[in-house]
Amino acid sequence: MDSSIGIKGRNFAIVAADTKISSSILVVKENHEKFQVIKDRIVMAMTGNQGDAFRTMLYVSESALYEEIQNGIELSPSVLAHMIQNKVHESLRRRQLDISSIVAGRGPEKYDLWSVDKYGAISSVPFCASGYAAYFVYGILDREYSEDITIDAALSIMQKCVNLLKERLMINLEGFMVKIVTDDGILTRTLVPEIKG
C-alpha cells in the first residue's frame, strides 16, 4: 500500500515512505527503498506504479546531474520537482505515469518540500502526504505542525501517522523508511507501527 509523508522544518526536511511493493493482492517485496538521494542534500520519494516510479526517479536524477554539469544549473528541490512535473506532463497524453512524488531537501536559501501529483500539479508545502496516506494523515499533520518544529517533534508526528495507517489500512505495513535531510547530510531511520495494547 504505497504511502509517503513529508515534513519541512527551518533546518531540516523529512520524508518517510513505506517499504512494501504489492501488485494486486500479492506482496512482491517487503524491504524496497522508494527513495532517490541526490548529492547528499535532496531526497525524492515516489508512490504509485513502481516501474513508472523507478524509471522516472532514475531519469530525473540523471537528467538533473547532466544539466548541472552541462549548463551549470544548481540542483535544488525546486528544480527536481519541476523536472518531475515536466516528465508527468509529457506523458499525460500518451501513457499517463501513475506516480505521485515528494521532493525534499536543502535549496540555495532554505529547506524545501515539494509535492507533485499524478497529473503534474505541483506545490511547495510545509507538509504533505501521497498515496494512501493522503486519505488519512492530513488531520494529524494539520493539527500537529508548526513552523518552528524540531526533528524530534516531526518524527513524533510521523510516528502518529504510521500508527494511524497501521490501524486503518487492510494490508499490514511492516514499517516506513525515513530520510532526514540536515546540514550534516542525510540520516536514515525506520519507523515501525506501535500496536495499541
UniProtKB/Swiss-Prot annotation:
Signal sequence residues: none
Pfam families attached to this UniProt entry: Proteasome
Gene3D superfamilies: Glutamine Phosphoribosylpyrophosphate, subunit 1, domain 1 (3.60.20.10)
Any one of the GO CC terms: cytoplasm
Keyword NADP part of the UniProt annotation: no
Main location: cytoplasm
One GO process term, biological-process aspect: proteasomal protein catabolic process
Compartments, record wording: Cytoplasm; Nucleus
Top-level division of the source organism's lineage: Eukaryota
This protein's UniProt keywords: Cytoplasm, Nucleus, Proteasome
Record family assignment: Belongs to the peptidase T1B family.
Function: Non-catalytic component of the proteasome which degrades poly-ubiquitinated proteins in the cytoplasm and in the nucleus. It is essential for the regulated turnover of proteins and for the removal of misfolded proteins. The proteasome is a multicatalytic proteinase complex that is characterized by its ability to cleave peptides with Arg, Phe, Tyr, Leu, and Glu adjacent to the leaving group at neutral or slightly basic pH. It has an ATP-dependent proteolytic activity.
UniProt subunit comment: The 26S proteasome consists of a 20S proteasome core and two 19S regulatory subunits. The 20S proteasome core is composed of 28 subunits that are arranged in four stacked rings, resulting in a barrel-shaped structure. The two end rings are each formed by seven alpha subunits, and the two central rings are each formed by seven beta subunits. The catalytic chamber with the active sites is on the inside of the barrel.
Protein name: Probable proteasome subunit beta type-4
Gene assigned in the entry: PRE1
